Structures are given as structure tokens and as C-alpha cells.
Design a protein with these regions (language model features):
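A polyampholytic, Gly/Pro-enriched intrinsically disordered region
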Residues: 100-105, 292-305, 387, 469-492
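Hard-cation-handling environments
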Residues: 229-374, 386-387, 422, 437-439, ...
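Short, surface-exposed amphipathic charged segments that create phosphate/polyanion-binding patches used
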Residues: 150-154, 287-295, 415-417, 465-475
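Short, compositionally biased "basic patch" segments
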Residues: 191-206, 293-300, 370-396
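Charged, amphipathic alpha-helical linkers/stalks
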Residues: 458-518
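His/Asp/Glu-rich metal-coordinating catalytic cores
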Residues: 1-55, 60, 64, 71-252, ...
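A general structural motif
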Residues: 185, 218-223, 312-324, 343-345, ...
Length: 535
């Protein structure tokens, strides 16, 4: 058999791997890159019409977003996924296609004035519909024969509703080899969904490494942390704007806010309104509610048994139309606005940032991973000014983050997952991580006795009775992004340090009036940090 690494190698988006075995060709994921590329994804080395099927680990666009393009270019095979993943993809791919069409239309309107050539969307709603029609949904833990010599099974990996690791048994020349693709490995104790499943055996493992170089630390009390942020923002008559992934993270936030309201943890603001301003998030919430309870954790099932909807509460409002979305920012009542996209690269969240970033009384709360070169990452790293819709916006709002709130396992979680294999796999391929993170995690595994490597896009391996052999090295050439001299200066590491200092000052200002005990602890921590670095 042969494997070709096509995307999300030494970067975290655009997942795609080609498996050629037993006379068949299958893609494991077919994701869209988000943010600026670090390394160019490689073209699929065979015609889309020659691919027999796609195995989707979960519904996030960085794992499924190029399926409509694959279909547009001639793919007609089946797309295999869990039932919830198939359901979620039915809304997420339509939404992605809508964004493609909208952006192309906007560029063409703008380009007409300058005489630019018209642009075509990457794919259309029709392409997305055609891809959705090819999905086949399956239950967890059920063996599925794709073709003679190829059997797969989806197991819950606790990252997102429907997310899975995929076990693949390939039989060639009378010998069976087992591959495991981890998918995105989930964090422990997330609301609603189950914890990751730990597998016992595999010959070759392909695993993600998003947080392979860091720990989430002790799990905070997210409900208490979120309640404090809401309280102090509402007390200064501001809005809490939360850029959130429409699927998974939004429902997690609703779970937390329901508990905050049930326990009256935010006082003096009545039944404060909470807006879901994302048609996709609204549809995803419906799918969560309609999903079989066997996909949920014990706590969620206990609530359901009592007749409690875990993601519903008084004051929850949804805005579907553009007019409803615009009306949110004309209402002076302090509120929570949850909107997509989670990295602020597209969607209605950009309008809410435009209306709230410049207001000192407001808070922008990040609740998920922010990839390099995204607007969300820039704000977290202390940007003073950002451009939205061609307009320069001064950043005066409080910028904060619920740290550790992640759908991805941290370093310890990843190590626990890979160490569940007994005996150790013959080789572990490290994928889906930022450039240096993949190298660091591969080195960590090597030190623990694993045979580990981090392939680059385009790398090709043969796996057979003699083991795994690299047939072709991947490309290590970085994509050069043209930036102005001023932007280049802003991207330096020292500038990041200055921005972090400015952010610290804003956080100090926002803590004015806090409890003396908390302020003293904060001051001690800052002084200890200064003592460490004052050279």
C-alpha cells in the first residue's frame, strides 16, 4: 500500500491524506486551508474521478471543506462518516459554499469599477449539494467493508459531535496491516460529548499534534470564569462578543450559560439576552438536539432524563436574517453575542467586531484555538488596530480568553492516547500541527521509544511486509507572503512582546475595583515574571 500526505502537515488546516491499497484509492479527509498557508498543499496525484471514496473524521471545514470542489472536478465515490458527521456536513458544506459565492460576488462588484477580470467561486451551492448526496452515515464501532481487502471502523474520539478516529484494516497478499488515523483528539470532560476512546492495537498511527508542545494546565471552573467576565462587562454597560465555531463550541457555551442563569451567577442584569447570530450555529444546535442520546456523556443524559434541555434557557435569542443581525447592535441593553467564524476570518462576527472593538466597555472573548495569521490570533496577541471592511478600527475593548477551553487534547492528552497502544506501533506519523510543534512532538515520542516522524506535504510512503519506506520527500519550501515594511516590523517577535505588554496593561485596567486579595495575587505574579526577565 502507499500513502501520500497532501495537507495539514506542519500546519493545522487542510487535512488530506491519500491511501492507495488493495486496488483502491481513498482520501482520509479533504479539508480546506484556513488563514494564510505556511506550506502549499499538494495537488491530489490522481484524477478525482479515480478516487473510490473519502473517509471523513469529523465535520469541521478544515477536514471536509474541499469535498464540493472534489465533486465539481469529477469525484463520484462515496463519502463515509458517522451519522452526526454526515448531518453536520449537510449544513456546514452549504454554508461554506454560500461564503464562496458571496465573496466572489463581492470581489466582482468591487472589480467592475477597476476593470478587473471576474472571479469564479471555488465551488457553488450546487457543488455542495452534490457532495452531500454522496455521504453515507454509520454508527460508531461498526465494521464496514469498503472493498475486498479494506475494512474500516469509526470510534468516538471526543472532539466534536460525531468526531472519530478511523481504524483501517488492509489485507494484501494474505497479510493484514492495521492503520489508525486519530482525527482530532478531544479534550477531557467537555460538556455534552464523550471523552476520547483509547485504542489498543495498530501497526501504523497517523495522529494530530495541535497542542503537542503545551499543556492546558489545571482545568478552570469555566462557568465561574465566564460568569465573572459577563458580570464585569455588563456592569460597565458593555456587550460580550464571542467569536465561536458554530458547531461544537457554540453549544458548549450555551451549556455553560444555562448553568450560569440557573444558579443566578450574574446579578443586577435580569434575564440578560444571549444572541446566537449565525444561521449555521442555529442549524447545528438543532442537530445536537435531534442526535441520538448514545452520542452524549453521562451528565448530559442525566439532564435529559430530568426533562432539562442542556442548551436552552430564558433569554436565548436567534437571528437568522441580515436585518435581525444588524438590529443586535442597535439595542443598547448589555448582551452576549455569539457569532461565527471562530477565528474571525469570515461571517457575521466581523460586523460585530466592527461595532464593538472600539468600545472600552465591551469585551471580546475568545473561546477556541486561533491559527497563525488569522484576525483572531492578531487580536489575542495585542493588535492595537485592525482593518474590517476597509475601515481601520482601534482596539479598545477588553480582549480575553477562556484558557484551556479546547476541543483538542493537550500534550498530556495526546501522550495518553498514543501510549494506549500495546505494543507500540511500528511507526507514528505526526500530522495536523504548526511547523515547530510537529517537530517537538515527534521528538517527544522518539524520546519515549516510539519510531516517529513528521512528514511534509507531498511526502509519500510505501507500507508492506518489509515495513514503511519513504518513496518521496515532501516539500519544505515556505510560501512567501508579500507584506509591507510596516507589517513586516509588526510581525517580529519583539513586536509581539510589546503587544503582549500593552494587552497586560489593558487587563490591569479592567481589573480596577477587584477584590484586594485577587489584585495582590495578580501583582505578585507580575512582579515574579519581571524578576525572572529583568536582566
Amino acid at each position: 500500500m502507499k500513502l501520500t500526505f497532501l495537507g495539514a502537515n506542519h500546519e493545522v488546516t487542510g487535512s488530506c491524506t491519500l491511501l492507495e491499497a488493495a486496488g483502491q484509492r481513498y482520501l482520509i479527509d479533504c479539508g480546506m486551508e484556513q488563514g494564510k498557508d505556511v506550506y502549499e498543499n499538494q495537488p491530489i496525484p490522481v484524477a478525482p474521478g479515480e478516487i473510490d471514496g473519502v473517509l471523513a473524521t469529523h465535520a469541521h471545514i478544515d477536514h471536509t471543506g474541499l469535498l464540493p470542489l472534489l465533486v465539481r472536478n469529477g469525484f463520484r465515490g462515496r463519502i463515509y462518516a458517522t451519522r452526526p458527521t454526515a448531518e453536520l456536513c449537510s449544513i456546514m458544506l452549504r454554508d461554506s459554499a454560500h461564503i464562496q459565492e458571496f465573496e466572489a460576488e463581492w470581489k466582482n462588484r468591487k472589480g467592475q469599477r477597476s476593470g478587473a477580470e471576474p472571479v469564479e467561486p471555488m465551488y457553488t451551492i450546487q457543488d455542495a449539494e452534490a457532495a452531500i448526496a454522496l455521504f453515507r452515515g454509520y454508527d460508531y464501532n461498526k465494521e464496514i467493508e469498503l472493498a475486498p481487502g479494506i475494512v474500516i471502523r469509526f470510534v468516538d474520539v471526543g472532539h466534536l459531535l460525531g468526531s472519530s478516529s478511523i481504524e483501517i484494516w488492509v489485507t494484501e497478499n494474505g497479510t493484514t496491516t492495521k492503520l489508525v488515523f486519530s482525527g482530532d483528539i478531544g479534550n477531557h470532560d467537555q460538556p455534552i460529548i464523550k471523552d476520547p476512546t483509547y485504542l489498543k492495537d495498530a501497526d501504523y498511527v497517523f495522529m494530530e499534534s495541535t497542542y503537542g508542545d503545551r499543556s492546558h494546565g489545571p482545568r478552570p471552573d469555566y462557568v465561574a470564569e465566564l460568569a465573572k467576565i459577563l458580570q464585569r462587562t455588563f456592569d460597565r454597560d458593555g456587550n460580550v462578543v464571542i467569536p465561536s465555531f458554530a458547531v461544537g463550541r457554540t453549544q458548549e457555551l450555551l451549556y455553560f450559560i444555562r448553568e450560569i442563569k440557573e444558579k443566578n451567577l450574574v446579578t443586577g442584569h435580569g434575564c440578560f439576552p444571549v444572541y446566537i447570530d449565525s444561521p449555521l450555529a442555529i442549524e447545528a444546535t438543532r442537530i445536537f438536539k435531534d442526535t441520538d442520546s448514545s452520542c452524549f456523556d453521562e451528565e448530559t443524559n442525566a439532564l435529559l432524563a430530568k426533562g432539562i434541555d442542556p442548551i436552552q434557557f430564558p433569554g436565548l435569542k436567534v437571528s437568522v436574517t441580515s436585518d435581525e443581525s444588524r438590529a443586535i447592535n442597535t439595542d443598547p441593553v448589555p448582551k452576549v453575542i455569539i457569532s461565527a467564524s471562530g477565528m474571525c476570518e469570515a461571517g457575521r462576527i466581523r460586523h460585530h467586531l466592527k461595532h464593538n472593538l472600539w468600545r472600552k466597555e465591551c469585551t471580546v472573548l475568545f473561546v477556541g484555538y486561533q491559527a497563525v495569521n488569522t484576525l483572531g490570533r492578531s487580536l489575542l496577541e495585542g493588535a492595537d488596530n485592525v482593518k474590517l471592511f476597509g475601515e481601520s478600527i482601534e482596539v479598545q475593548a477588553e480582549i480575553c480568553q477562556l484558557t484551556g477551553l479546547s476541543g483538542h487534547a493537550d500534550r498530556e492528552g495526546l501522550l495518553k492516547w498514543v501510549n494506549s497502544f500495546e505494543p507500540k506501533p511500528k511507526r507514528v506519523f505526526i500530522i495536523h500541527g504548526e511547523d515547530e510543534v510537529e517537530n517537538i512532538f515527534a521528538q517527544t515520542l522518539t524520546e519515549q521509544g516510539f519510531n516517529a516522524s513528521a512528514p511534509y506535504n507531498g511526502e509519500q510512503w510505501a507500507i508492506g511486509a518489509e515495513g514503511a519506506v519513504c518513496l518521496k520527500e515532501g516539500t519544505r519550501i515556505r510560501i512567501e507572503h508579500h507584506v509591507s515594511e510596516g507589517a513586516a516590523r509588526a510581525a517580529t517577535v519583539f513586536q509581539r512582546l510589546l503587544n503582549a505588554g500593552k494587552r497586560l496593561l489593558r487587563v490591569i485596567e479592567h481589573n480596577e475595583g477587584g477584590a484586594n486579595k485577587d489584585l495582590a495575587k495578580f501583582a505578585d505574579q507580575i512582579n515574579a515574571l519581571c524578576d525572572k526577565w529583568d536582566r
